[in-house]
């Protein structure tokens, strides 16, 4: 991946679930950049400019598309790092591509051909999250849609598989299975711990297992990790129940670098 410097480490996509404001985004980016620089981890800042897929109609969706995208552009410029955001509609692809380096396809949308093709045609790296309903082997077809549209800058992300009602499980056999397609494979260490569609209308999670999933991902040879992190997850406007507190990030990454070095 030309986006990242050469390193023997995994790369990291990390940041808040959604852009809540400029000051917070800059603080989180600053801390993540400092930590990953010290640990020699290639890093891209993640932040959704809009959350289109929410449980309830009154759930927070964003501060405004253009405003959020301009914040992502500021992070990109001031820290000199790649930036990733989700897109949900074909028209989002061209709009977001002006501000970010990686366009992320949400898991629920990973089979949407027109969306994948629109993302591909921007020339940006496309990170496709594996649907909770798909076998790893099926992701070759999502990747092929992007490649056939003329873009081979592709990443695939494991984010858990539906396990009965309101639960997900990560099958780590899927990492080497997807790596066979020739693209970097990322493990989403926070969304894979969601407890979706709770009766309250707010998605739950098991953040106490983030370290477990992260260690397993590195041990099995994942190319990259995806983590959502926040200064105070309890007050986050989206996905707070499965985010990593920002003050725990350095300790966790330090352990993961040691595991990677032992392989």
Language model features with spans:
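Alpha-helix-loop-beta-strand connector modules within alpha/beta enzyme cores
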Residues: 31-39, 58-84, 119-125, 175-185, ...
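Active-site mouth loops of central-metabolism enzymes
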Residues: 14-27, 55-63, 81-86, 105-108, ...
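Catalytic beta/alpha-barrel core
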Residues: 63-64, 78-92, 101-114, 125-136, ...
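N-terminal amphipathic alpha-helix/helix-capping segment at the start of soluble metabolic enzymes
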Residues: 1-13, 70, 261-263
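Structural preference for beta-strand elements that scaffold enzyme active sites
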Residues: 9-13, 40-46, 82-84, 101-102, ...
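Glycine-rich, proline-tolerant flexible connector loops at the mouths of alpha/beta enzymes
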Residues: 12, 16-24, 43-65, 229-239
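C-terminal alpha-helical cap/extension of soluble enzyme domains
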Residues: 45, 199-263
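Catalytic alpha/beta core domains of metabolic enzymes, predominantly
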Residues: 123, 127-229
């Amino acid at each position: 991946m030309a986006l990242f410097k050469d390193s023997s480490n995994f790369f990291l996509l990390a940041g808040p679930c959604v852009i809540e404001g400029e000051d917070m985004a800059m603080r989180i980016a600053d801390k993540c950049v400092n930590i990953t620089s010290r640990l020699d981890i290639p890093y891209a800042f993640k932040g959704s400019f809009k959350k289109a897929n929410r449980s309830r109609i009154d759930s927070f969706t964003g501060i405004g598309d253009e405003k959020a995208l301009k914040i992502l552009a500021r992070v990109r410029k001031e820290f000199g790092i790649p930036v990733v955001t989700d897109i949900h509609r074909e028209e989002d692809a061209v709009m977001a591509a002006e501000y970010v380096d990686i366009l992320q396809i949400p898991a629920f949308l990973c089979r949407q051909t027109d969306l994948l093709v629109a993302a591909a045609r921007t020339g940006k790296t496309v990170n496709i999250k594996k649907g909770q309903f798909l076998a790893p082997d099926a992701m070759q077809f999502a990747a092929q849609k992007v490649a056939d549209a003329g873009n081979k800058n592709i990443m695939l992300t494991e984010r858990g598989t539906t396990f009965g009602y309101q639960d997900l499980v990560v099958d780590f056999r899927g990492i080497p299975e997807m790596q066979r397609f020739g693209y970097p494979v990322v493990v989403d260490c926070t969304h894979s711990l969601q407890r979706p569609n709770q009766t309250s209308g707010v998605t739950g999670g098991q953040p106490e297992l983030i370290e477990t999933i992260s260690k397993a991902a590195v041990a099995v040879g994942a190319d990259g990790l995806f983590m959502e992190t926040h200064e105070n997850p309890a007050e986050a406007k989206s996905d707070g129940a499965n985010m990593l507190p920002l003050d725990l990030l350095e300790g966790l990454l330090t352990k993961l670098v040691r595991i990677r070095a032992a392989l």
